[in-house]
């Protein structure tokens, strides 16, 4: 992934790295591969394991005694109690690269990090694979220089419209792109029922699974359109308050991204309607 060099570079300066992003977007796979590459004996521990999670939540000091740095803590949002103890460790030792963490509930994580680890952690976000990663093209910094962009166009083979739509339908989850899962319909159906519905319940409690599935379908049908809570509420047969709450949840889980309009005026960027 194009982010690999960035993580290794930041690990030379920061004691903690927090990588957020949707589930199954490749966060853990990439960090475990980098752990082998750096060869520091970094331990891997996942808070998806309920026994491990219980210790992290109820006795974070003991957790860090057992799982000594350097350590990779997966799904750290399940135990925000760890952040205070990680802060104490960093303040006492300040060893670059001690803590690598991943999390799939973005805004929920940010609150805990901002309260406890402000200035001590490098925050990174990983989306599913970019088109450049999928085709194996080199990573280049973003630029608006037309000469550079035209040169890049010459390096990448053009594709026809059916191929573009096939890429859209396939999506960019590593499991699909790599061919690990051949049936994409089954993959995405299982993804919704296994991860999304479980995480939604974890965030908001009880949720009507059928209505929420209908809501996700309505949101997906409006990709690249202006966000319209009223229309989404009508399609899912819910009220607008619930529609707004569910949009927030999907954004928190990294399932959707809200693109706010560009404006030199910060206030206008805030109040104008974003696109999904």
Specify the residue positions occupied by each region the protein language model found.
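Pre-Walker A adenine-sensing motif
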Residues: 1-11
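Hydrophobic anchor at the beta1->P-loop junction of P-loop NTPases
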Residues: 19
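P-loop (Walker A) phosphate-binding loop of NTP-binding proteins
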Residues: 22
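Conserved lysine of the Walker
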Residues: 27
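Hydrophobic positions on the alpha1 helix immediately C-terminal to the Walker A/P-loop
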Residues: 30, 34
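Conserved catalytic/switch belt of AAA+ P-loop NTPases
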Residues: 83-107, 111-116
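Short regulatory helix/loop adjacent to the ATP-binding pocket of P-loop NTPases
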Residues: 107-123, 135-140
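Accessory nucleic acid-recognition modules appended to NTPase machines
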Residues: 177-276
């Amino acid at each position: 992934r194009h982010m690999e060099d960035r993580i290794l570079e930041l690990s030379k300066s920061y004691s903690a790295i927090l990588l957020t992003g949707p589930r199954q977007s490749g966060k853990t796979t990439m960090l475990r591969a980098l752990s082998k590459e750096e060869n520091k004996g970094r331990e891997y521990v996942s808070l998806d394991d309920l026994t491990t999670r219980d210790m992290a939540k109820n006795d974070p000091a003991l957790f860090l005694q057992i799982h000594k740095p350097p350590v990779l803590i997966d799904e750290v949002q399940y135990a925000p109690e760890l952040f205070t103890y990680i802060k104490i460790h960093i303040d006492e030792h300040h060893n670059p690269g001690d803590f690598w963490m991943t999390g799939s509930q973005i805004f929920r994580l940010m609150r805990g990090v901002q309260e406890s680890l402000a200035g001590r952690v490098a925050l990174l976000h990983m989306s599913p694979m970019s088109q450049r990663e999928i085709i194996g093209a080199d990573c280049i910094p973003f630029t608006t220089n037309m000469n550079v962009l035209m040169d890049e166009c010459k390096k990448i083979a053009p594709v026809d419209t059916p191929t573009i739509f096939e890429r859209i339908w396939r999506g960019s989850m590593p499991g699909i792109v790599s061919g690990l899962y051949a049936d994409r319909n089954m993959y995405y159906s299982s993804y919704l029922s296994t991860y999304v519905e479980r995480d939604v319940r974890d965030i908001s409690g009880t949720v009507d699974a059928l209505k929420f599935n209908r809501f996700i379908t309505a949101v997906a049908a409006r990709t690249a359109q202006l966000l319209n809570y009223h229309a989404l509420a009508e399609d899912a047969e819910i009220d607008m308050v619930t529609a707004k709450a569910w949009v927030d949840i999907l954004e928190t889980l990294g399932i959707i991204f809200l693109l706010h309009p560009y404006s030199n005026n910060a206030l206008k960027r805030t109040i104008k309607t974003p696109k999904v």
